[in-house]
Amino acid sequence: MKQAVIVDCIRTPMGRSKAGVFRNVRAETLSAELMKGLLLRNPQLDPNLIEDVIWGCVQQTLEQGFNIARNASLLAGIPKTAGAVTVNRLCGSSMDAIHQAARAIMTGMGDTFIIGGVEHMGHVPMSHGVDFHPGLANNVAKASGMMGLTAEMLGKLHGITREQQDAFAVRSHQRAYAATVEGRFAKEIYGIEGHDANGALIKVLQDEVIRPETTMESLAALRPVFDPVNGTVTAGTSSALSDGASAMLIMEESKARALGLPIRARIRSMAVAGCDAAIMGYGPVPATQKALARAGITVADLDVIELNEAFAAQSLPCVKDLGLADVVDDKINLNGGAIALGHPLGCSGARISTTLINLMEDKDATLGLATMCIGLGQGIATVFERV
């Protein structure tokens, strides 16, 4: 079987969704700039070799509608001979794009793919136009479409306290801020034009949503937002609302080597799994277990892990049941996570994978895992191996 490898991976800075730096920048532009960036960073690649552009996006309407993958690829000047498709596995969309490209390469259906994802949550809110079929209530809990309430349920089932959630959130902001100050995001962030608070055009080079001033005391003052009476999940322990995109150049290994392109990581295994929609945040557990089994390794073999932080109340049960509670500070989300950086839905899968690969390089690590939960009860996971 042919091998799929990551040649390059980049992301935009994460912009605040409410009056943030990308308030005047469209989702197609965020996407197109990264597509162009991959080609500029890898001049050995003839763009005419691109088989397909596979782009994750959840809210496929307004500026994100009508196949944003094709719209953005045309905007970027990708040759018209390349295909383009937009995929939607909710929060796991751009990780699913990774999987689709990898499967195509492994089965000989192409050897050069640009993948990624985008979500401009300031322009197209998560709830825009959502209309669940009333019959779903016959099969799943009525609150299953309310992500915050699923986090409340999962946290309660696993005895996760408010204090544990607050501490996890503080850690996310501290780690992300330290990574910013120390330049650890510099290799993955691709500067995009935006506007400052006064409306001046600027090159955005850093994430906007990190709150380094976050403390246990400031979080303790916040009220539960999803279950005001009995809940523990607050805005501060939930992923921030942000706008952003991420992108990867994925190729067949021998083709990349023939062109003299760098091989940053190999895709070792992939998996998706389902779980009860009422505790959708638990999805990373069965998905990770599948991916590890397919790779022929155990969780102890992993050097670095990126677990998408949809909610602290969701992440902590996954950490516990994957047997990772004792290695959080050594292996998991070492540069912070979505609580600090935000979770632009269609962007996040390739974003956490990009961060993971950079961390693996920084730490000279061999094996890494990127995994995330998905609304309505799914999980997705990818094991990467440096070569």
Swiss-Prot record:
Main localisation: cytoplasm
Cellular compartment(s): Cytoplasm
An annotated GO BP: fatty acid beta-oxidation
Pathway entry: Lipid metabolism; fatty acid beta-oxidation
NCBIfam families cross-referenced by the UniProt entry: AcCoA-C-Actrans (TIGR01930), fadA (TIGR02445), PRK08947.1 (NF006510)
Annotated function: Catalyzes the final step of fatty acid oxidation in which acetyl-CoA is released and the CoA ester of a fatty acid two carbons shorter is formed.
Protein name (database record): 3-ketoacyl-CoA thiolase
Organism: Shewanella putrefaciens (strain CN-32 / ATCC BAA-453)
Gene: fadA
